[in-house]
Amino acid sequence: GTNASMRKAFNYQEVSKTAGKNCANCAQFIPGASASAAGACKVIPGDSQIQPTGYCDAYIVKK
């Protein structure tokens, strides 16, 4: 499922508009079964459709 209210609060985008910044390289992202599969996010609970290509205001580069 998705968490529409939290997505809106963090201005989540399915495809990042910022080069080099996306869910796949964010510390908050919980990867799915493969590199291109949808995953989850530590700051958007109850959402299993977070795209690795996505981006939101909670982005923190993975160290």
Swiss-Prot record:
Specific class of high-redox-potential 4Fe-4S ferredoxins. Functions in anaerobic electron transport in most purple and in some other photosynthetic bacteria and in at least one genus (Paracoccus) of halophilic, denitrifying bacteria. It comes from the Bacteria. GO terms for molecular function: 4 iron, 4 sulfur cluster binding; electron transfer activity; metal ion binding. GO terms for biological process: aerobic electron transport chain. [4Fe-4S] cluster binds at C23, C26, C41, C56. The lineage of its organism: Bacteria, Pseudomonadati, Pseudomonadota, Betaproteobacteria, Rhodocyclales. Keywords: 4Fe-4S, Electron transport, Iron, Iron-sulfur, Metal-binding, Transport. Belongs to the high-potential iron-sulfur protein (HiPIP) family. InterPro entries: High_potential_FeS_prot, HIPIP_sf. Homodimer. The gene is hip. This is High-potential iron-sulfur protein. Pfam families: HIPIP. PROSITE patterns: HIPIP.
